[in-house]
A protein has these predicted regions:
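Long, intrinsically disordered, low-complexity Ser/Thr/Pro-rich regulatory/activation regions
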Residues: 396-406
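C-terminal lobe/tail of nucleotide-utilizing enzymes
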Residues: 200-355, 364, 373-382, 388, ...
C-alpha cells in the first residue's frame, strides 16, 4: 500500500524545510511511520532536524537516517536525494540505446552533468524516487521538502504535460507499429515506452487522493503574490492543495494592552510590523477567496531538532476559511435547443483570478486553458469534440464555454449526443 505524500512548496527563505520537518515530527509523535525527503539540491533538512544526513539515492549507499523512534510505534526517518546521481543512473541506461539509434551523434560522449541544465529533468527523477519510497511499504506518510516554488511547480506539473505531448507527437499506436523489424528502432520505441509509462505513473500518482501540497509563505507582499500564482497554477494543473501555512507571524498577546505604548524603537517596530502583517493577511484572504490558514509564530530562536519543531506547530493558530481551490472538474450539460441548434456548455470552477490573466484556445479535441504562464489541456467530452466554440464567459470564478454542433461532422438527423466521455 502506498503512503500518503505531502509536498511542501514555497519561496526560498520562508521556512519550508522547517515546516516540512515539523509536520513530519508531529506525525511521528502521533504514532505514524514517517519519512521526510529533501529534493532540493541546496539541502538544509539535516540542519533543521539537528542530525547529519548524507545525500544519497534510494537503494544506493545512503539509506534514510533514523531521527526519532517513539514508544507508541511512531518513527521518523530522513533522506536527502541526490538528483544528479539519479540522472547519472538514468543516462547510463538511455545513452547506449540512443547512440545505436543515432550512430552519427556523439551521445556516448555526453556527460550526465551536461543534462542537468535541461529544465525539469532532475525534478522528475526526484519525483520518481519519491514515488518509489512511498510505494515501498515502509512508511505511512512521506513528507517532501521541495526546492523553491518554480522548481517545485515544474516537478509537480511536468509529468502530466509530458505524457500528453509524447502521445500527441508520437501516438502509441504509431510507436508500436513502426519499424519493429529494426532492432535500433525497436530499442528506441522501448525507451520511449518506458519513459512514457514512468511519467504516466507519476501523473496518476499526483492526481490521487492521498497526495497533496502544502503551500508555505511568510506575511510579506512579494511572497504572497508568488503564493497566489502558485495556488492558481496548482489548481489549473490538477494538483490538490491541502493547506496554506503562513510562517513567522507576530501574534498579539491577548493579555497585553498594545495602545499607548512608550515611545521606543522596539515598540514602534513591533506595532508597525503587526499592522503590516495584518494587512498582508487580509490581502491574501481576498486574493485566494478567503481560504483557511495555519499561522505559525515568529520565534525568538530557530526551531532546530525534533523537540523544538514539535513545539512550533503546537503554538500554531488557525484562521477559518474555505478549502483551497481544488483540481479542475469539467461539468458538461445541454443548455438549450436541439439538433444542430443545440447549445452545450462546459463549466469549470477556477481559482480566484483576474480575467486579464485568462486565455482560452482549442487544439483538436482539447480545450487549452492559460492562466499567466501556465497552460493546461483539458480533454473535451466526446459530444463536444464534434462541436465548435461559440463563446466563453467568466463570472466570478466560474468559467463557462459554450459549443454548438459542427454541421460538417455532426451525425445527420442526430438530436444532440451523449454527455460524457473522456475529460
Amino acid at each position: 500500500m502506498s503512503a500518503r505524500i505531502g509536498f511542501f512548496v514555497g519561496k526560498g527563505g520562508v521556512g519550508k524545510s522547517t515546516l516540512a520537518a515539523a509536520t513530519a515530527v508531529q506525525a511521528a509523535l502521533a504514532g505514524e511511520k514517517v519519512l521526510v525527503v529533501s529534493t532540493d539540491q541546496a539541502h538544509s533538512l539535516g540542519d533543521v532536524l539537528g542530525a547529519p544526513i548524507q545525500p544519497g539515492r534510494p537503494g544506493g549507499e545512503s539509506e534514510p537516517v533514523r531521527i526519532l523512534a517513539e514508544e507508541q510505534g511512531g518513527e521518523l526517518d530522513a533522506v536527502e536525494l541526490d538528483t544528479l546521481a539519479l540522472l547519472e543512473s538514468a543516462w547510463r541506461l538511455a545513452a547506449p540505446v540512443l547512440a545505436v539509434r543515432f550512430p552519427e551523434s556523439d551521445l556516448n560522449d555526453v556527460a550526465p552533468e551536461e543534462l542537468s541544465a535541461v529544465p525539469g529533468i532532475q525534478e522528475v527523477l526526484g519525483l520518481g524516487a519519491v514515488a518509489d519510497l512511498a510505494g515501498s511499504g515502509r512508511w505511512d506518510y512521506v513528507v517532501v521538502d521541495c526546492a523553491s516554488t518554480a522548481d517545485a511547480l515544474r516537478m509537480l506539473t511536468l509529468p502530466s504535460s509530458f505524457a500528453v505531448y509524447v502521445e500527441r507527437s508520437w501516438p502509441r499506436h504509431r510507436r508500436l507499429s513502426t519499424g519493429l523489424d529494426d532492432p535500433r528502432q525497436a530499442a528506441m520505441v522501448a525507451l520511449v515506452e518506458s519513459m512514457h509509462a514512468q511519467v504516466a505513473r507519476l501523473a496518476e500518482l499526483l492526481a490521487g487522493p492521498d497526495v497533496g501540497t502544502h503551500l508555505v509563505l511568510t506575511p510579506e507582499r512579494v511572497v504572497v503574490a508568488e503564493t497566489v500564482r502558485a495556488l492558481t497554477a496548482l489548481a489549473v494543473m490538477g494538483i490538490r492543495v491541502n493547506e496554506v501555512i503562513v510562517n513567522q507571524v507576530l501574534f498579539q498577546d491577548d493579555s497585553f494592552e498594545y495602545r499607548n505604548l512608550p515611545e521606543h524603537p522596539a515598540f514602534d517596530w513591533y506595532a508597525a510590523r503587526i499592522g503590516e502583517q495584518t494587512a498582508v493577511l487580509d490581502h491574501l484572504a481576498a486574493a485566494t477567496g478567503d481560504v483557511k490558514l495555519i499561522l505559525t509564530p515568529h520565534l525568538a530562536g530557530e526551531p532546530i531538532g525534533p523537540k523544538a519543531l514539535a513545539q512550533l506547530l503546537d503554538q500554531a493558530r488557525r484562521r477559518d476559511g474555505g478549502t483551497p481551490p481544488g483540481p479542475l472538474r469539467p461539468i458538461v450539460d445541454r443548455e438549450s435547443g436541439s439538433g444542430l441548434e443545440t447549445i452545450y456548455r462546459l463549466r469549470l470552477q477556477l481559482p480566484p483570478l483576474d480575467s486579464g490573466e485568462l486565455s482560452l484556445g482549442r487544439a483538436g479535441d482539447d480545450l487549452i486553458i492559460g492562466v499567466g504562464a501556465v497552460r493546461r489541456r483539458v480533454r473535451l467530452a466526446s459530444v463536444l469534440r464534434r462541436c465548435i466554440v461559440t463563446g466563453a464567459a467568466l463570472r466570478g470564478s466560474e468559467l463557462t464555454v459554450r459549443f454548438r454542433p459542427d454541421p460538417l461532422v455532426w451525425p445527420a438527423g442526430a438530436d444532440g449526443g451523449a454527455i460524457g466521455g473522456d475529460q
